[in-house]
Design a protein with these regions (language model features):
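Positively charged
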Residues: 1-150
Length: 150
């Protein structure tokens, strides 16, 4: 497939709401493969489609067990227990900062074939799910930052 160019951090596209995916076809599969390749190239933890200029509700997350693809994801459960996590972005020019996130979350989504799937994550994986899903609604981690990391 291919490696896509990343959208610059200050691009206004990051403030837009991504659209729901309705077609599960070769075009979507190519996009998912490109997102995986791009994430691997930059050695990142997560990539929302908006990172490559596509306003679709798609997230790809790197996990110890491989890459998790989430289409139209929704956080369906979040722990009351929280954690402070240092976050940044694969977007060029992004700052870093500390954000409070749930310690664990459960996400409902669709897989690349349109089948329902549920994944759970704790610690950094939970924070990554939250961070990337926020992007789909035009929310940046800097909106939630408690202290910046200079």
């Amino acid at each position: 497939m291919g490696i896509r160019n990343l959208t610059e951090w200050n691009d206004p596209i990051f403030r837009k709401t991504s659209r729901t995916v309705e077609k599960f076809d070769e075009r979507l599969w190519n996009l998912l493969d490109d997102m995986r390749d791009t994430l691997e190239k930059v050695n990142g933890y997560g990539c929302a489609a908006v990172h490559i200029g596509v306003l679709r509700r798609i997230v790809v997350v790197n996990d110890d067990n491989g890459v998790i693809e989430l289409i139209n994801p929704t956080i369906t459960d979040a722990s009351e227990e929280t954690q402070e996590v240092q976050e940044g972005s694969i977007a060029p020019g992004a700052p870093r900062g500390y954000v409070i996130r749930p310690k664990s979350v459960t996400v409902s989504a669709l897989d690349r074939n349109g089948n329902p799937t549920t994944v759970s994550g704790a610690d950094f994986l939970a924070a990554t799910f939250c961070h990337e899903i926020d992007h789909l609604d035009g929310i940046l981690f800097t909106d939630k930052v408690r202290k910046k990391n200079i």
